[in-house]
């Protein structure tokens, strides 16, 4: 199958983004050359260029500057929509390492709100805020968090559904699908 796009999300940094984009662009150059040769030979071109999608999975805690207790936060993947979004991911990553490093590089919702433009947010599966609240606290608190993400990111908030045969995933998926239907949020299959 020919994929039109491929994404990469490093944990808390964008260190692999340069090599990732470079390799996709090299693939696209090779695909274009092969398609040109096919056309010149009277054949149907079969190579498909790919779009590189750059993202970062952040540890989102209550206060990224606090070092009074270990709070690794929730794991939330963010995707750049464009160059400005990429720059915002880079700013978030820098803040995570410069100001928020305590066991892991962390950000919080306040700094996320400063750099959310042109960024897509995913719910984060079982280790995301909503999934964790469904499992460990309760549906009302999970729905409150769900609505916060929807309010902040609007149509750029997507829910991840995981299926590895785990009972926890089944429980979380059932509730997430209910929230998605109730609040008109899109979802997708993920494999975290």
Model-predicted regions and their roles:
Residues 1-191:
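Phosphodiester-processing cores and adjacent nucleic acid-binding clamps
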């Amino acid at each position: 199958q020919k994929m039109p796009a491929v994404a990469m999300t490093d944990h808390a940094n964008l260190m692999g983004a340069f090599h990732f984009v470079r390799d996709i662009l090299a693939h696209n150059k090779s695909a274009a050359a092969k398609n040109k040769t096919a056309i010149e030979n009277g054949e149907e071109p079969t190579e498909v260029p790919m779009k590189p999608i750059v993202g970062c999975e952040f540890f989102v805690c209550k206060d990224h500057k606090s070092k009074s207790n270990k709070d690794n936060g929730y794991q939330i993947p963010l995707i750049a929509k464009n160059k400005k979004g990429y720059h915002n991911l880079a700013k978030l990553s820098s803040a995570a390492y410069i100001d928020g490093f305590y066991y892991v590089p962390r950000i919080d919702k306040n700094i996320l709100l400063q750099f959310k433009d042109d960024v897509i947010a995913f719910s984060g599966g079982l280790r995301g805020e909503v999934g964790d609240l469904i499992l460990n606290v309760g549906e009302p608190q999970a729905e409150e968090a769900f609505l916060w993400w929807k309010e902040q990111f609007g149509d750029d908030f997507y829910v991840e559904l995981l299926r590895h045969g785990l009972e926890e995933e089944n429980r979380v998926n059932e509730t997430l699908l209910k929230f998605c239907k109730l609040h008109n949020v899109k979802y997708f299959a993920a494999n975290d």
